[in-house]
From Swiss-Prot:
Entry EC no(s): 3.5.1.5
Coiled coil residues, start to end: none
Single GO cellular component term: cytoplasm
Complexes and interactors: May form a heterohexamer of 3 UreC (alpha) and 3 UreAB (gamma/beta) subunits. May also form a heterotrimer of UreA (gamma), UreB (beta) and UreC (alpha) subunits. Three heterotrimers associate to form the active enzyme.
Organism: Streptomyces avermitilis (strain ATCC 31267 / DSM 46492 / JCM 5070 / NBRC 14893 / NCIMB 12804 / NRRL 8165 / MA-4680)
Pathway(s) served: Nitrogen metabolism; urea degradation; CO(2) and NH(3) from urea (urease route): step 1/1
Similarity annotation: Belongs to the metallo-dependent hydrolases superfamily. Urease alpha subunit family.
Cofactors: Ni cation
Gene: ureC1
PTM characteristics: Carboxylation allows a single lysine to coordinate two nickel ions.
Pfam families: Amidohydro_1, Urease_alpha
Cofactor comment text: Binds 2 nickel ions per subunit.
HAMAP family (alphabetical): Urease_alpha (MF_01953)
The protein's name in its UniProt record: Urease subunit alpha 1
Length: 556
């Protein structure tokens, strides 16, 4: 077979290159687990049959589901073509699929009772982890799932002024509400309190998995130190939206309060909130895990104009008041927006998130992250004839790094044996924009569906929508609730959710050095007069894009 016919049938081989949508990014397949000439393939007259590449054995001795011959892009695995075996919702094996009785070198034993997801020609990534979601509407989950997000760390439980949920009563109902959605969920408690009692209550009695300290509710010395002390005691993360007015603390003061303790600094560029004008200084600090929210990604020509109205709306400002108008404008800085993209490319900012309905868009984090990668390639070039390193660096910002920051990485964030089979399948031409299928614990949960009255499932109109994993009792059975260990130790669990409870862990004493492929630290400075950003004395800037990829070609 010529290479093009082979790729169309069995997927790309080692050394083949694949373009990712219209992002301008290209990956090169590093290895292929198939045995050429004896490939595993399902279909009429193909090799996935009893006596050939299917082993006649009980499912418990093989796997429940196999994703065959898919190109995996993963911070842990690299970029390789493999098959993925799934048993009881977890990844049980990765490598060559088939029947060890008839094929040498089999890693994924496929039985006559195994369901097959044909991955030939598709790309697999771990489900994205969005750690910054304001849950002001349940419909956010539609946008998140349709973009490839399978884990959400949220705040609020509807259109209320929350910025963290502490009430055990409210958390109980919020967890129950999520039983309708096939996503893993964790809630941040409000950390803006001078007394630890409501924080401990949120963890132990409510099941919160961390804290959010927010300037709108108080990000002063006592509140920040209290949240950090409770977090250190209970091994949970603290997310910080720092004091933008510098009323109580400057960025230098905040770093002194941290005193080396780990924190996750939200929207570290500053337009989403934080110390004006130089919160970006926190990006290079060894104990600060910085993240960006998607409204400023990538830096575009309309970014400055767009954000004024969003800031006014989200923070309940009164633009007729000169002080309120000035506060909004002070947060919008073209220099830091342009530098943000470059700091991501250098690995100095390790996470991207949505800030959904708190200025961000729930369904755009994945595509804006890869649009930013494409913009950086267009502006600064690529060292090789492929973009593997850049693609893996940006994918890590969406998957393993947010999982590491919030203590979820023992369950989600990468395609590794033992982890939940939260896997997103993409057609290469739609990569980053629209998934083909979202598997939640290996079960089809969301994806492309055709006309329900058609003769085949591929008849148009094709739309993204819920699969069987999003119906009935299944969403809760295939998803988990992330909680503090204190909630499990309490022993009087009143949460009625049917989800398995999983304790977060490993959130303290970590920093950028512990993130995958995004470990750059250094002295980041912002000139308060000109807005120029430097990293270790070198100017950091990029130009605003006139257009961005993964956008109008795919969405009206």
């Amino acid at each position: 077979m010529n290479p093009y016919a082979y790729a169309a049938t069995h997927g790309p081989r080692a050394g083949d290159r694949v373009r990712l949508g219209d992002s301008g990014l290209t990956i090169r397949v590093e290895s292929d687990a198939q045995q050429y000439g004896d490939e595993f393939l399902a279909g009429f007259g193909k090799t996935a049959r009893d006596g050939l590449h299917l082993k006649a054995a009980a499912v418990r001795d093989t796997c429940d589901v196999v994703i065959s011959n898919v190109v995996v892009i993963d911070a842990a695995q690299g970029i390789r073509k493999v098959s993925i075996g799934i048993r009881e919702g977890r990844i049980c094996s990765i490598g060559r699929a088939g029947n060890p009785d008839t094929l040498a070198g089999v890693d994924v034993v496929v039985g006559t009772g195994t369901s097959i997801v044909s991955g030939e020609g598709l790309i697999a990534t771990a489900g994205a982890v969005d750690t910054h979601v304001h849950l002001l509407s349940p419909r956010i989950m539609e946008a998140s799932l349709a973009s490839g997000v399978t884990t959400v760390i949220g705040q609020e439980f509807g259109p209320v002024w929350g910025v963290g949920v502490n009430s055990p009563w409210a958390l109980r109902h919020a967890f129950s509400a999520f039983d309708a959605w096939p996503v893993n969920i964790g809630f941040l408690g409000r950390g803006s309190s001078s007394d630890p009692a409501p924080l401990v209550e949120a963890l132990a009695e409510g099941g919160a998995s961390g804290f959010k300290v927010h300037e709108d509710m108080g990000a002063h010395t006592r509140a920040l130190d209290t949240a950090l002390r409770v977090a250190e005691e209970h091994d949970v993360q603290v997310a910080l939206h720092s004091d933008g007015l510098n009323e109580c603390l400057s960025v230098e003061d905040t770093l002194r309060v941290l005193d080396g303790r780990t924190i996750h600094a939200f929207h570290i560029e500053g337009c989403g909130g934080g110390h004006v004008p130089n919160v970006l200084k926190m990006a290079g600090v060894p104990n600060v895990i910085g993240s960006s929210t998607n409204p400023t990604l990538p830096f575009g020509r309309d970014a400055v104009a767009e954000h004024y109205g969003m800031i006014v709306s989200v923070h309940d400002l009164k633009p007729d008041l000169p002080g309120d108008a000035a506060m909004a404008r002070d947060r919008i800085r073209a220099g830091t927006m342009g530098a943000e993209d470059v700091l991501h490319d250098l690995g100095a900012i390790g996470i991207t998130s949505s800030d959904a309905q708190g200025m961000g868009r729930a369904g755009e984090t994945v595509r804006r992250t890869f649009a930013m990668a494409g913009k950086m390639k267009a502006e600064f070039g690529a060292p090789e004839d492929h973009d593997n390193a850049r693609v893996l660096r940006y994918l890590a910002k969406l998957t393993i790094n947010p999982a590491l920051a919030h203590g979820l990485a023992h369950e989600v964030g990468s395609i590794e044996v033992g982890k939940l089979a939260d896997i997103v399948l993409w057609r290469p031409e739609f990569f980053g924009a629209k998934p083909q299928l979202v598997l939640k614990s290996g079960f089809p949960a969301y994806g492309v569906v055709g006309d329900p009255n058609a003769a085949t499932d591929t008849c148009e109109p094709l739309v993204l929508g819920p699969q069987f994993g999003a119906h009935g009792a299944t969403p809760a059975e295939i998803s988990v609730a992330f909680v503090a260990q204190a909630a499990l130790d309490q022993g009087n669990d009143r949460m009625p959710t049917r989800r398995r409870r999983v304790a977060v862990r490993g959130t303290r004493g970590i920093g950028p050095a512990d993130l995958r492929l995004n470990s750059r630290t250094g002295a980041v400075d912002v000139d308060q007069r000109t807005g120029l950003v430097t990293l270790d004395g070198d100017p950091i800037r990029s130009e605003p894009a006139d257009s961005v990829s993964l956008n109008r070609l795919y969405f009206l």
